[in-house]
Each structure stands twice: as C-alpha cells, then as structure tokens.
C-alpha cells in the first residue's frame, strides 16, 4: 500500500484523496470478498411503493473475515489518525444496471468534519461528485456532476472535511449488463462536532402523499 495519495480540493474546506492501485492483489481480493460475504438485497420506499435497492450489501461479522481489508483498515486509521469502530461495509454492484443516486451520507448526523474511505474492487465504473448547488440541475451533463474519478481495481478514494456537507456523490446506473461486477468497501468516521443534520437520509422513505 505504497501508492501515492493525491488530494483534490473541491472547495476551501472539502477534499477527496485518490490513490490509484492502493490495495495490492485487488483482483484476488475481489473474488474472495464476492464469494465469502453474506450479501443481502435492501429495499427502499420510493414512488409510493417498496422497490429493491439496485445493489447488494454486506455488513458486520461476515465482512470481518477478509484479512486484506482488516489490514487496509489499520493502514487508513494510521494515516488519517481516526478510528473506524464499526469496521467496514460492502456494496456490490452486480452489473451496469446497479447503481446509487446522488446523495450525501447524512445518516452520520455530524457532517462538518468527516472521513469516508472507499476502496474499489472489480470493474471500473464512473463515480461522480457534484456540489449541492447543482442538485436540481438535471438538464446539465451527468446531472450536474463536476468530477468523475472513475475508480478501478484497488483504487482508494477518501472524502474528507466538509465533503458530506456541500457535495453529493453517485455511482450512476449504466443500463448495461455487460459491465462487470464492482465492490465498494467503505469505512466512515465523523468528529461529532458542529451542527447535526436533521433532514432525512438517503435510505429514508420518500413520500408524495400522506403515509
């Protein structure tokens, strides 16, 4: 894990670190994680009905079976001087039809100083960032995205500072089953300082009528 980490400043207080090929033997780790994780299909309340989340997820003890990821967590904690007490979560995008819409990780509640680390395994996919000011600009290219980091196997991305306050990120759906599988490994930390988020998170039900 000696890849150089380059910092991209999004504005005065929000940044993203990127290290290409940060995780060694990423293809082997992908196959191991894919085979050994207990994948679950989530559901979201959208458009007045429950819909299946367009990706699979894994969390908890089953995720801790992967020694390469445990070692990666130690490296990240040492470098960023934070602790990830909840371990890591896994998101599996089975093909190009899976994805995740633009969102902020508001469920962390305190978003003014966070560290969210992502390691990508498997196929290279678009990964968009846009300022919140563009969140209604759907007529713009890529729905207002200003950056596409296109992470590939073993790449590390770390969102920090006020990134969860003023920026949104997305793994867009490509509508193409020929795109290979992609796994995102996620670690999250918040300083628990500043103003708490009170708005609903990404997974909260979206209702357009009375419940």
Features from the language model and the residues they span:
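Non-heme Fe(II) oxygenase metal-center motifs and adjacent flexible, charged/small-residue loops
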Residues: 1-211
């Amino acid at each position: 894990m000696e890849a150089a980490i380059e910092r991209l400043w999004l504005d005065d207080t929000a940044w993203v670190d990127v290290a290409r090929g940060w995780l060694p033997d990423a293809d082997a780790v992908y196959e191991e994680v894919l085979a050994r994780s207990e994948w679950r299909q989530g559901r979201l309340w959208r458009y007045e009905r429950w819909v299946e989340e367009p990706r699979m997820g894994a969390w908890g003890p089953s995720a801790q079976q992967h020694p390469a990821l445990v070692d990666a967590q130690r490296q990240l904690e040492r470098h960023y001087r934070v602790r990830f007490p909840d371990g890591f979560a896994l998101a599996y995008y089975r093909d190009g039809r899976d994805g995740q819409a633009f969102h902020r990780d508001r469920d962390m509640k305190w978003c003014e100083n966070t560290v969210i680390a992502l390691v990508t395994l498997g196929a290279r996919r678009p990964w968009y960032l846009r300022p919140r000011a563009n969140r209604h600009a759907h007529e713009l290219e890529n729905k207002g995205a200003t950056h596409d980091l296109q992470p590939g196997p073993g790449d590390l991305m770390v969102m920090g500072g006020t990134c969860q306050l003023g920026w949104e990120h997305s793994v867009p759906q490509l509508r193409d089953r020929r795109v290979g599988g992609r796994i995102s490994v996620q670690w999250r930390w918040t300083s628990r300082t500043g103003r708490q988020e009170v708005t609903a998170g990404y997974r909260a039900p979206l209702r357009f009528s009375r419940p």
